[in-house]
Swiss-Prot record:
Record organism: Rhizobium etli (strain ATCC 51251 / DSM 11541 / JCM 21823 / NBRC 15573 / CFN 42)
Record-given protein name: 1-(5-phosphoribosyl)-5-[(5-phosphoribosylamino)methylideneamino] imidazole-4-carboxamide isomerase
Family (UniProt): Belongs to the HisA/HisF family.
Keyword Chloroplast assigned: no
Pathway participation: Amino-acid biosynthesis; L-histidine biosynthesis; L-histidine from 5-phospho-alpha-D-ribose 1-diphosphate: step 4/9
């Protein structure tokens, strides 16, 4: 299991939203690159970055901040938000991203995702953001009639590296991960699933280490880390101890 610390970018700053609402943004760090280095120094193995402005605009809007993050950390970085074309994907991967996350385009043009997986094997993830059980697009601003599992199944066998599943109704409000829908999705597809939205405490980390949740690749944590509700050392110690136990 991997715990992915999150950096959400708005106006070049590191922020957290509540329920995906751009009007409810709390600034946590004005220097995203320094935040990325801090997460690396704390012992995290990966970094999850979202260009919030880009998600709404439909194109990269915090490119300078992302470039600075890539220079500041040796950790692999996954980026989502506003990446909608093969050219955008190739440009970001060539700059050092480990993988891109495709959200809106996965709904609008699933064939592009499949083509991207062929062209960049192991480096394309799909972001499924859901509200009320239905997939949301355009930076969570628009709801679709598409079901979560219905969308995920479109990419079975395509080579998608992971599905990042976000429950918008829980994002940024520290109410705990929506375990029922997250595990239902993980059971329905062979693609690794990463849980996002609502991770609130070490109890969520412990829950992820239970046998029925081991199919998950990991979870993303934002506000709980920034607000000090999760101690990085304690969380990573739990994860590493579990990893050692599984490989013993």
């Amino acid at each position: 299991m991997i715990l992915f610390p999150a950096i959400d970018l708005k106006g070049g700053q590191c922020v957290r939203l509540k329920l995906g609402d751009m009007q409810q943004a709390t600034v946590y760090n004005t220097d995203p690159a320094a935040q990325a280095k801090s997460f690396e120094d704390q012992g995290f193995e990966w970094l999850h970055v979202v260009d919030l402005d880009g998600a709404f605009a439909g194109h990269s809007a915090n490119g300078d901040a992302v470039e600075a993050i890539l220079k500041a950390t040796k950790n692999p970085v996954q980026l989502g938000g506003g990446i909608r074309t093969l050219d955008h994907i190739e440009a970001w991967l060539s700059r050092g991203l480990r993988r891109v996350i495709l959200g809106t385009v996965a709904v609008r043009n699933p064939e592009l995702v499949i083509e991207a997986c062929r062209k960049f094997p192991g480096r394309v993830a799909v972001g499924i953001d859901a509200k009320g059980g239905k997939v949301a697009v355009e930076g969570w601003a628009e709801a679709s009639e598409l079901g979560i599992i219905e969308l995920a199944k479109k990419f079975e066998g395509a080579g998608v590296a992971a599905i990042i599943y976000t429950d918008i109704d829980r994002d940024g409000i520290l109410t705990g991960i929506n375990w029922s829908s997250t595990l239902e999705l993980a059971d329905a597809v062979s693609i690794p699933v990463i849980a996002s939205g609502g991770l609130a405490s070490l109890n969520d980390i412990k829950r992820m280490l239970q046998p029925d949740a081991r199919k998950l690749e990991g979870a993303i944590s934002g506000r709980a880390l920034y607000d000090g509700r999760i101690d990085p050392k304690e969380a990573l110690a739990l994860i590493n101890a579990n990893r050692a136990k599984e490989t013993a």
